[in-house]
Swiss-Prot record:
It comes from Vibrio parahaemolyticus serotype O3:K6 (strain RIMD 2210633). Catalyzes the transfer of a methyl group from 5-methyltetrahydrofolate to homocysteine resulting in methionine formation. The active site is at H699 (proton donor). GO terms for biological process: methionine biosynthetic process; methylation. This is 5-methyltetrahydropteroyltriglutamate--homocysteine methyltransferase. The gene is metE.
């Protein structure tokens, strides 16, 4: 019997972001719901056709989402927060939960969106389910069942996908005190029983139930919850229990006791688990081997995967299935659109559409199809050739990596000495004021950038236009009387892509979009070779800005770990090595900035915490190399050069040691929404260096009053000595307009001056 092939999910945004543009038109009122739904139906039909035409055994349905798949599950279960409830849940209900509802939109006091957070350690996000003790669950929104009917009527053999009950509970949060959301499990399971009964009535043979939390180090009560859950929802539909992003080593003994029919494991993220899983797989179970990486853009070495899976095929026979490691929603849609890539570079990649073909081809090869076996070998040649290419593995970069020593990551003087030097050179007042780096990216800037990229604006004219925006930003900051200025980053489209475009070793794409959440898509650059800086990147802009003012101008860099986390990494070397290469390139930029007279340099690291591995036992090793990469990038700074870093997290406690180990002279953090509560971690740790807790929530259009900012600064001063405090917004101001930016910053400067006078 032929090897069963399938994927865990397919990108829903469309190859040219058709879903994004339709959603935003609908939200603006430019199209009605019928037109929006037609776009969704057309995308689903195309996605299913891609899978069937490639020869997959199953076509996956239920993976389409109008915002994110967790929110889709929330509506399926009729579990809508009370502030958004009212009548039967529909598409507008879903958008209200995800985006919030203004006072004008509902004729009421408005209703806040539910929280959003990262989907495990990916750059995808989901709307967090809210739980209270009186919650009930009832199958409500029929989208899943309608999609199955659509797919069946189109002639596809359907395998629906459903987020599992235990993961759904785990990924949410309690919104009232004194109760544990796990106590809701029996009620939730009643709804899941009804869902599976409905699937059975639709003729579904297999359902993919995603329980990604099985890859975590679960507390006992959560691990134990699976037994009850899967005993109660047992039905006539066969269940493929699906895990991804890490190994199931910690939970495997419990998994194999569950009354399910198969297990999917991620052999891309955790290849080492294969032998253990095969050895413990219960008689009669299917093993779905996730060997085609759903989280990256690289072509699979299918000949190597074939060799790896053949012994498993011999043991399991038709009980071995071949699959993507996780949903392909984390990959761009179709490589064929990238007409501007060189043939060599293009031959290294596979986007979602190509990965579907990889899965199907590998399945045929495992069945002994000689043409497929030969095709796997031919297909894998570019990846094999790449391993020895000198323009990929550059000798000059390797020499620098081999010469990294412990001293390379250390500043030439301890913080206390540096602080004294900096106080003398910089001459800043108590409670110095600054911003985080970016200023409003106006429509004019975006039009000029687009015109330059399409050849309608010459390079010299574009540079003059950017200098005009920088001069304007400097003038506005001087008028506000900020103490440390920034150039505003008018030249940057994105804080990571800008550096990727200016460092050798990266490839950017035209259509390499992946969904972040809702209608927001990102286009990560791809690390294709050893990374090096061939020429200065930011020096010209920073020195031009400094020439316009006698105040200190802050140089602005994105840190090595953030660039790594927000790009598609290479698969042939470790993430640690990529971070070191980035660190060495940024180190050179730091040296050039200070040699050009820039005395303050900010190295942003908003993603250090995001890069944490899923298993806590792996945190220490990651944090050691992540911190070391930052320190390498900063350590070329002289004692009198002040190094800043910026982070925006909601939780510092578990990484405060590592934050301190960065040894930045100043750290700025996002604290305004937490009313300075986040500073507790720094207070309890006795954080030794300077700190700028954000006093202005830039994510809100509300203008903070002078009194409000003053109150926040006073709260901060209760936890951190005032001599070590800075005053700044939470984050960059790129997404705000100038009117609200200047109004907020005027209040920020006034509050700082008032307190400065009181403390004098």
């Amino acid at each position: 019997m032929a090897t069963t092939t399938h994927i865990l999910g397919y990108p829903r945004i469309g190859e040219k972001r058709e879903l994004k543009f339709a959603q935003e038109k609908y939200w603006r009122g430019d199209i009605d719901q019928t037109e929006l739904k037609k776009v969704g139906a057309d995308l689903r039909a195309k996605n299913w056709q891609t899978q069937t035409e490639a020869g997959l055994s199953f076509t996956t349905a239920g993976d389409f989402a109008w915002y994110d798949h967790v929110l889709t599950t929330t509506l399926l279960l009729g579990h809508v927060p009370k502030r958004h409830a009212g009548g039967f849940p529909n598409l507008d209900t879903l958008f209200k939960v995800g985006r919030g509802q203004s006072q004008a939109g509902c004729g009421c006091a408005g209703a806040a969106a539910s929280d959003m957070t990262k989907w495990f350690n990916t750059n995808y996000h989901y709307i967090v389910p809210e739980f209270s003790k009186d919650d009930t669950f009832e199958v409500s929104w029929p989208q899943l069942f309608e999609e199955i009917n659509e797919a069946v009527q189109a002639g596809h053999k359907v395998k629906p996908v459903l987020l599992g009950p235990v993961s759904y509970l785990y990924l949410g949060k309690e919104v009232e005190e004194g109760f544990d959301r796990l106590t809701l499990l029996p009620r939730l399971l009643t709804a899941y029983q009804a869902i599976l009964a409905k699937l059975a009535s639709q003729g579904v043979e297999w359902v993919q139930i995603d329980e990604p939390i099985l890859s975590l180090e679960l507390e006992k009560q959560w691990a134990d919850a699976f037994k009850l859950a899967y005993q109660l929802i047992r039905s006539d539909v066969k269940v493929l229990l699906t895990t991804y992003f890490d190994s199931v080593t910690d939970t495997l003994d419990k998994i194999v006791e569950l009354p399910v029919d198969g297990l999917h494991v991620d052999l891309s993220a955790a290849p080492q688990q294969l032998d253990d899983v095969v050895a413990k797989l219960p008689e009669g179970w299917v093993l779905s081997a996730g060997v085609v990486n759903g989280r990256n853009v690289w072509r699979s070495d299918l000949s190597a995967q074939l060799e790896r899976l053949q012994p498993v095929k011999e043991k399991l026979g038709d009980k071995l299935w071949v699959a993507s490691s996780c949903s392909l929603l984390h990959s761009p849609v179709d490589l064929e659109l990238e007409t501007e890539l060189s043939e060599e570079v293009k031959s290294w990649f596979a986007f979602a559409k190509q990965k579907v073909t990889e899965v199907a081809l590998l399945g045929r090869a495992l069945d002994g199809d000689q043409n497929a076996i030969l095709a796997c070998d031919t297909y894998s040649q570019p990846i094999k050739a790449r391993k020895t290419a000198t323009h990929v593995n550059k000798p000059q970069v390797q020499v620098r990596l081999n010469n990294i020593t412990a001293s390379l990551a250390e500043r030439s003087a301890p913080y206390a000495e540096r602080a004294a030097h900096q106080a003398e050179v910089l001459g800043l007042p108590l409670l110095p004021t600054t911003t985080i780096g970016s200023f409003p990216q106006t429509g004019e800037i975006r039009v000029q950038r687009s015109a330059y990229r399409t050849g309608q604006l010459s390079e010299s004219d574009y540079i003059q236009a950017l200098k005009g925006h920088i001069a304007d930003a400097v003038k506005r900051q001087e008028a506000l009387d900020l103490d440390v200025l920034v150039h505003g980053e008018a030249e940057r489209n994105d804080m990571v892509e800008y550096f990727a475009e200016n460092l050798a070793g990266f490839q950017t794409t035209k259509f390499g979009w992946v969904q972040s959440y809702g209608s927001r898509c990102v286009k990560p650059a791809i690390v294709v070779a050893d990374i090096e800086r061939e020429k200065p990147i930011t020096v010209e802009w920073s020195t031009y800005a400094q020439s316009l003012t006698s105040k200190q101008m802050k140089g602005m860099l994105t840190g090595p770990v953030t660039i790594l986390c927000w790009t598609f990494p290479r698969e042939d070397i470790t993430r640690q090595e990529i971070a070191q290469q980035l660190a060495l390139a940024l180190r050179d930029e730091v040296s050039d900035l200070q040699d050009a007279g820039i005395n303050i340099i900010q190295i942003d690291e908003p993603a250090i915490r995001e890069g944490l591995p899923l298993k806590k036992r792996d945190h220490k090793a990651y944090l050691e190399w992540a911190v070391n990469a930052f320190k390498i990038s900063a350590a070329s700074a002289k004692p009198e050069t002040q190094i800043h870093t910026h982070m925006c997290y909601s939780e510092f406690n578990e990484i405060i040691d590592s934050v301190a180990a960065l040894d930045a002279d100043v750290i700025t953090i996002e604290t305004s929404r937490s009313n300075m509560e986040l500073l507790k971690a720094f207070e309890e740790f006795n954080y030794p260096n300077e700190i700028g807790p954000g006093v202005y929530d830039i994510h809100s259009p509300n203008i903070p009053t002078e009194e409000w900012i003053e109150g926040l600064i006073k709260k901060a001063a209760e936890k951190i000595p005032v001599q070590r405090l800075w005053v700044n917004p939470d984050c960059g101001l790129k997404t705000r307009n100038w009117a609200e930016t200047e109004a907020a910053l005027a209040n920020l400067v006034s509050a700082a001056k008032k307190l400065r006078a009181e403390l004098a």
